[in-house]
Amino acid sequence: MELSTAFDTILSDLAGGASILWLALAGVVLIVWDIFRNNAPVLPWLACLVVAGAAIIEVFRLGDPSSTVFFSLIQTGGPASFVSLVILISAFCSIVLSVPYLARIKHGYGEVYALILFATSGMVMLGTANNMVTVFVGLETMSIALYILTGLVRSDEGAMESALKYFLLGAFSTGFFLYGIALMYGATGTMYFTEMASGYAGSELQPLFWVGVALFLVGFLFKVAAVPFHMWTPDIYQGAPTTLTGFMATASKTAAFAALVLVLYHGIGTLAPGDGQWQLALALVALVTVVMGNILALNQDNVKRMLAYSSIAHAGYVLIALAAGTSEAYAGAVYYLLIYALMNIGAFGVMALLEWDGKEGRVQTLDSLSGIGFKKPLLGVTRGVFMFSLTGFPPLGGFFGKLAVFAPAVNAGLTWLAIVGVLASVFSGYYYLRVLYVFWMKSPDADDSAARSADFSVPRTSSIVIVGCAVLLLVIGLVPGLRDLTLSFFAQGGLAALP
């Protein structure tokens, strides 16, 4: 009987962690495949099938009650499946967009897609963690793969410099993160989020616990590019291949924020609800992040650097919701991450198509994109949808995403912070709409790259991904029932139901 029970438990654990295991094992298979069939053109499409298979698994789990597997190390079902889906959608779109891009720059290495699968496996583990050890393993699995992907173009000095910076600063932040976990464990005697409250109540080392929380947050705030731990972001985004930059900007941030939501909701946030000091600290970080991200993006002529500083500001918007510290706010944060992923996948996808024009020139500056909207209307129109949505114009998804993070802040008494967020969003319209002005209204100079080569073709697969992201942003905005259903799923049937 005991053997039968143990066997059933093993099967249940394997089924619960199927997405993570499937992605990791498939990554190994792709590497072996590439050894014998170097640069096989089928590799990216096999990677897409793997990611699609993992997504199908998570779709069927959306309606399941939240539960844990592998000794309660990983969560499955409900909101955990939703977070996994957002990550998997980002990975799938990034792979599809990477195929023509990497072929054009002659860096379509087979290991790229294996590394994306490894990174995605780590992201899913991170976003569904229920234990600090799982958080660390997922975080490092994700990070190591991203370090390598950043330096993919080995002949590009900028890419190699970016990879080295990312690795060194990432390792430095991991030290803070690990030390914080060690102190939190020493004070509470547990690594599980849900057991922190009971361990904290009987601890004589409560001040030590809060020192650990501070170090833990330093490590996490680096991963989400919050001020003052943001300076690595522009260089890494500029140096890395553009489609992979989009992957880093969306999937990794979704995973890191999802893990932070779980830690706050089940652990730190339950310990001192009447104190609010940790909430004030997060509110101040959110304030500085939103303001600095938008200010630094203002005068950027390089579009990738502008999007990098923009991503810093958007991290601040999510932190506004986390500072509110309510179930409604956490639901809004996760919902915003879905909108953010769609906006940035599309924005970086358009940039990837324009960045390399098939000649020698690399198109990254605003001036090099002058008048491209009329020459490539599909890219011009979809670019407009993404820029308007990033600004927060109704009825696009970006507007409702920001509403989902600002409204809980007002309800939690952080009206001043929500007002700053709204003003910053209005302020951001300047640099977002400047891109559209250049796209549609500025005449190209004779020596501009875009003027020299407007005849490049847009791959059909890339068009489907970019148009799909734009349509989803419109659907989410124009069909409020879908938005309300998603928010209620988290606020009532999702986060509240977690073990």
What is each stretch, according to the model?
Residues M1-P499:
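Alpha-helical transmembrane segments of multi-pass membrane proteins predominantly involved
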